[in-house]
């Protein structure tokens, strides 16, 4: 079956198969998926942006490796009211869709930043535990 773990901004789904051990590549993919929406909103927060520009940045940062993941996430974020888009004529072909954050999206992103900071701090404490002074 599929279990859904919901952390304030992380929606991870893990396929559980008792006959197959969890492998490192799957674990890496799941960790990246958990921060993908946050990264997409962060990129859009810099100003209106074309989807292929987002894809290039996410791919070069090794956050996204599958192109088919971006468009469903953009649709979900738009349906949630976090972003909007506008069509801009292009001299080199059909009009292009440029994404922008809404006010609700800006507020949501600010909350995610706080969650990200907390999460980084928490994980850092686990990875680098402080030994108590005697």
Predicted region positions:
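N-terminal helix-turn-helix DNA-binding core of bacterial DNA-binding proteins
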Residues: 28-69, 88
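Glycine-centered, phosphate/nucleic-acid-interacting loop/turn motifs that mediate DNA/RNA or nucleotide
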Residues: 81
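Short, intrinsically disordered or compositionally biased N-terminal tails of bacterial proteins
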Residues: 1-27
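Short secondary-structure boundary/capping segments
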Residues: 75, 90-91
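Basic amphipathic alpha-helical segments that dock to polyanions
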Residues: 70-72, 76-77
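Amphipathic alpha-helical dimerization/coiled-coil segments
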Residues: 107-134
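Basic, amphipathic "hinge/linker" alpha-helix immediately C-terminal to the N-terminal HTH DNA-binding motif
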Residues: 91, 95-113
